[in-house]
Every structure is written in structure tokens, then in C-alpha cells.
């Protein structure tokens, strides 16, 4: 019983620590380009050969920076648009590209296709269902086995029977605690997946072909790097054209 009390104390202390931890919010603002403020957002735009991009930082979701982006196809030809046409390049305070820890590669992150995220979430939810089913089987076997051992040792007064009863009782207690942990983790994970699934399913900035003189607006999600002081959002709509580039300053602010 002592180790169970110790386990509960650890969990309670962890919860208190997590509640007391100061949270910080990642902030970004455009630099180097003229911007306008609309609805509290700093908006920047560029146009080249009939293609116009309007962008603003819209917050953070999980490990991603979210940009509210609208792409206008003001040409007379169809234009294929994809979140993967966007890249995010983290930079240091001198606006030099950050590199991997070994210094070999320049860091850069590609935009996320919502459909791929939705497929991943569905796969992960299925994996979690299978995992909890396996855990239930293991827990049931442990509890039933422990109870049978307790019954078998009941009424016997030998030292061996006493030890068997002690082990069986411990096994049952372990299985009960494990069952609680398994179900807590399962529901927590499934809740997070459901919330993420709702976010991704509502995003309409997906790979599509824009007809001439139409536009598409939505959230573009790109992974961030906490070491960055600046970051450049690039949009490459044609291999024959220079990409659009928007420079943002990045910092963290305590909430």
C-alpha cells in the first residue's frame, strides 16, 4: 500500500506543478514590409504577374504557427494552390537561417495539408482503440489471476500461502491502478485527437486548382522553432518565378 500512496502523491504533485507553470504565447509581427492593421491583425501582401498573396499571423496550434492566407489568381489561367507551396524558414537575431544541431542542414518547414492530418488522426484513433483493448485484456488477466490466487491461499496458514496471498494482493492492486492509468491516458489522448480533428476538418486551405479571377482563403499551418528570433514565410507558386517572401519577427510573451 505504501507504494500506491507514493504513486498518488507523485501524480498530485505533478498536477500542482503543471498548474503553477507560467505559460508563454508565441507572437509574430511582419517586418521589412508595409502592413495594415485590420481586426487586430497586421496584414501584409505581395503581387506578381497576376498572383496576389495576403497574409497575417493568426496564432498557434499545437507546434504550428497559423497564418491567415488568401491567394488571388488574377490571371487568365488556372492556378494550382497547395499548403505545401508554403515554407517557413526560422532565423536567428541576425536573420541568418537556423541550422540543424549538427550544422549540416538549413532548417525549413513545409505547410501542412489538412487532408493528410485528418487521415493521420483517424489512423491514430484506431491505434488507440486497439491499444486500450489490449490493455483491458492484460488487466483482466492480472485481476482474475490475482483473485484466484487469493482464493486458493485462503484458509491456509503456511508461510508459503501467506506470501502467495501478499503477491496476489499486490498484483490485483497493480492491475487496478494500471487500469485507471490506461483509461485516463486513453480518454485524454482521444479527446486531444477529437479536438485536433475538428480543427483540421474545418480548414479549407487545401490543395486545389483556382479558376481564373478567383481566390482561396484559409489557415496555413507551418511548424515553428522556439530558437528563432525571425522567420520568413515563403510561397512558391511557380518554379519559373521568384517566391513571395514575408519576414516576421518572433518572440514569446508570458500570459
Q: How should each PLM-predicted stretch be described?
A:
Residues 77-85, 188, 230-234:
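Short, hydrophobic/aromatic beta-strand segments
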Residues 69-78:
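Asparagine-centered strand-capping/turn motif at beta-strand->loop junctions
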Residues 1-19:
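Sec-dependent bacterial lipoprotein signal peptides
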Residues 226-255:
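Terminal connector regions
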Residues 211-220:
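Short Pro-Gly-centered flexible turn/kink motifs
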Residues 13-36, 54:
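Bacterial Sec signal peptide processing site at the extreme N-terminus
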Residues 100-201, 214:
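Hydrophobic alpha-helical membrane segments
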Residues 61-68:
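Short, solvent-exposed loop/turn segments enriched in Ser/Thr/Gly
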